[in-house]
């Protein structure tokens, strides 16, 4: 199946859900795209906190958490795939070199996504990356699926600004992502782009 995905690469972009998006799991979502290729796409929803915080998560995996700045930080619902598995999006510890963690995907823009427990162990001792985003689950699209959803006006796309992920309160992330496009939520219509 030929797609236009060779023409666009949405890695290190935000997907911003349009009001007409039919999948309720993604209503008003902002998804940070960790990987996008002709084989599919993988991202993390950055504005849907779960009901547990990092202290709860660290207790569950039997690790102490010695960083007071993280104890009340929420664990997010990264998406509907593998919701029992943890994903840690963080700043690169050593930009331009191989990751210090066992199972890590390097993402353009100075970020990494790690799925191995060693990043949690580093955080538990006060070491590890300074800025982290932790989710359970991820979002995924098969070959051509995301491109089809974009052409159906389900998503807006914009290059990511890491400040939206790490420095913006959760309840403001959707609006901040829209502002990167010069838009506000009241400007969006569920019927936009449809004849």
From Swiss-Prot:
Pfam families: DUF179. GO terms for cellular component: cytosol. InterPro entries: AlgH-like. It comes from the Bacteria. Belongs to the UPF0301 (AlgH) family. This is UPF0301 protein Bpro_1142.
